[in-house]
Amino acid sequence: HLRTRRQRQMCIRDRALRDVEKEIERMESWATTPKPNVPADNLALDASVKDPATFIRTMYNLIYLAFKTDSTRYATYMLQSMNSSKWDNVPIALGLGATHHLLAHNAVKGGVHLERLGKYDKFQADLLAEFIAKLADTPEGEGSMLDSTVVLYGSSNSQTHVNTDYPLMLAGGEKLGLKPGRLIDFGQVAPPLSNIYLTLLNALDVPSQQFSDSN
């Protein structure tokens, strides 16, 4: 039994060493891969929050180029942060007269307050639409880059800081078995957000039975 246990431990050790060797080989291969040549014409790398449209558009263009050159296959971008004095003031830079935090809280009053928040939401949505259109217009295989890319656009908590009824948008992924182009209203059912993440894991060939509190 002792001999069997030692053999098992040696097998585990050898497997772990081989995994480390493979990872080192992968990293060395990536490190020596020539960097792609990409046009920088549409990249305003000196953009700042003082010109939010140019800054956000540049960030989306960087993500697009990273995908196009296969420099990465995963990207996250936090478009807004109310905890950042710079980004919370973006609506003021756009002439909307208040910080994003105040716009969100005052929207419940309706009238001009709701209209201002709507304009800011549209500002962000228009830039997202440009990014999605660029993916859709880029041929890839037998379809477009959007067909094999998942774009998940989220939101913040509600006016009362409640983290339910999040509006979310999922675009692309038709080649991955997803079915975009639908409006789904869950009403009072309130399924956990992790259900979406579980669906995406499986669509992206990461077989999973559970993710967080998914049901």
What do the predicted segments below correspond to?
Residues 1, 49-56, 114-125:
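Short acidic-aromatic active-site loops that bind/stabilize oxyanions
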Residues 1-12:
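Single conserved hydrophobic/aromatic residue that forms the stacking wall/gate
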Residues 7, 74, 165:
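Broad gene-expression machinery/nucleic-acid interaction feature
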Residues 68-71, 79-215:
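Feature marks hydrolase-like catalytic cores characterized by long aromatic- and Gly/Pro-rich stretches
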